[in-house]
Amino acid sequence: MNVLDAGIEGVRSITQPCQLVILVPVAAAVVAGRASWRVVVAAVSGIAVGGWLFITRAIVVGDAAIRWSSLIVICAFGVLLWRRARTPGDLRAAPAVEAVLAAAVGLVTTTWWRPCVGEQLGELLTRGPNEPWATLPASVAFMVGMSTPILAIGLIRAAWQPTPRVAMTLGFVAAGAGLLLGLSVVSGQHGEVVATLFEWSQP
């Protein structure tokens, strides 16, 4: 299996709405975590690991478990919201907590995924359950490619360097949005949203 082809297909897949179920909450977590490179790398790592577990069917999550898993996302965004509400002076410490929370959001939201299957991902999903380690490199390549918007947020943050007040405001808004997304999953809206995104992704 060609790792490069899998990565390219992952990049191309970001135009498909069905990927938003992962990208939107993770982007919110990254912005809420001040989009440092530590937070960005942690978030993408969470997506990569979660995606591999999804592809290999190492973890199969039903609707009830998805609603329970959303509590992790709600707690993560709750902590991020609380930290963003603190004064700028309290935000100067290295964002280790934000990195852990972003990784958790990336890992959990992959269990909410209903992927739009292309050639490479289709092969991964077919071979993954029986050949988990053989499909690991290509699976990671696909998920990292799909995470290109998250990496772009890190680049924009590095180039822009917003003031502490602006960064805190953006983080506060992003954390609040992520909290609402988590609550929508708990309330049972996830299935309808994912089905709609999947339909939008069909040619």
Where on the chain are the PLM-derived regions?
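Alpha-helical multi-pass membrane helix bundles of inner-membrane/thylakoid proteins
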Residues: 1, 62-114, 159-173, 187-203
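Transmembrane helix boundary and interhelical junction motifs in multipass membrane proteins
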Residues: 17-25, 112-124
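Membrane-water interface of transmembrane alpha-helices
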Residues: 16-24, 76-88, 145-158
